[in-house]
Swiss-Prot record:
It comes from Rhodomonas salina (Cryptomonas salina). The gene is psbA. Its EC number is 1.10.3.9. The keyword Plastid applies. The record marks Y161 as: Tyrosine radical intermediate. Pheophytin a binds at W126. Keywords: Calcium, Chlorophyll, Chloroplast, Chromophore, Electron transport, Herbicide resistance, Iron, Magnesium, Manganese, Membrane, Metal-binding, Oxidoreductase, Photosynthesis, Photosystem II, Plastid, Thylakoid, Transmembrane, Transmembrane helix, Transport. The chain crosses the membrane at residues 29-46, 118-133, 142-156, 197-218, 274-288. Residues 345-360 form a propeptide. This is Photosystem II protein D1. Chlorophyll a PD1 binds at H198. The keyword Oxidoreductase applies. The record marks H190 as: Stabilizes free radical intermediate. It catalyses: 2 a plastoquinone + 4 hnu + 2 H2O = 2 a plastoquinol + O2. One of its GO terms (cellular component) is photosystem II.
Amino acid sequence: MTATLERRESASLWERFCSWITSTDNRLYIGWFGVLMIPTLLTATTVYIIAFIAAPPVDIDGIREPVAGSLLYGNNIITGAVIPSSASIGIHFYPIWEAASLDEWLYNGGPYQLIVDHFLLGVCGWIGREWEFSYRLGMRPWISVAFTAPVAAASAVFLVYPIGQGSFSDGMPLGISGTFNFMLVFQAEHNILMHPFHQLGVAGVFGGSLFSAMHGSLVTSSLIRETTENESANYGYKFGQEEETYNIVAAHGYFGRLIFQYASFNNSRALHFFLGLWPVVGIWFTALGIMTMAFNLNGFNFNQSVVDSQGRVINTWADILNRANLGMEVMHERNAHNFPLDLAAGESLPVALTAPAVNG
């Protein structure tokens, strides 16, 4: 009997690279979507840090009045921001090679587009990487589905809203006070507080926080003790164990008696599906609301909707909100030639019954 030994052909460099990229044994899973995610997020992060520290002022309104947003130009952590691209650029794609010089690119807010575009590509790559990793481990894809909610929200404020408004200068500035400024201006121009999709988003975020706190406290309070009184309860568990960690029957009974019977779940799958579904759907609706308001399908307007028998207006909270919106709009549009149309086109509202006497 003759035995023949053959040398095994070594895998090519490409095959070894593919095996390494898709290996679930790596300390951090990379995956093919990670090949897209890693360079784009690194680019966005690097440019953001540099721009936040040292970017020169940007002509955001396209009227030769640059606005400084970086730390080296007098801002602090709270007031600093990466200023959106100039209104003179509109929604045109504005990479570095489209500008006549680097100074012109910086003056027109080119870093904002570079950061936003790479960031959105990166977070989409993160979604794909979550799905890919789950697939290779034999898990179901709901982790990546849940992450579509924040990605939809980011896409709404950084991409869809500027496109709908006709300029990337209307996008959300990349900073703390810039975010609040964006929120105030958005309310002034679109009355988002009166939009049902935003209200669903508020219910999703605050409701999700409440349900998460309730669930965590109930689980922690109903752990099954596997140790003695002299040992920490944490020593009685190991990651991936088959046995239940907590007593869902006890938690269900406690909560059912605290409120009422049908307010609690006695099925762990249904409970956790609900905990994941509630905030995700709420944020989906908020993102959808931003996208509809991007094209000026705004919140409800109930201004001057209540009148008495003589036809005189009885002011409601909607009218107070409208007055606040007009005030925020005036503060936002600080140039006379940009005077808000909703103020310029309507009848003048008296703010004083008599003119003040001026002594001088």
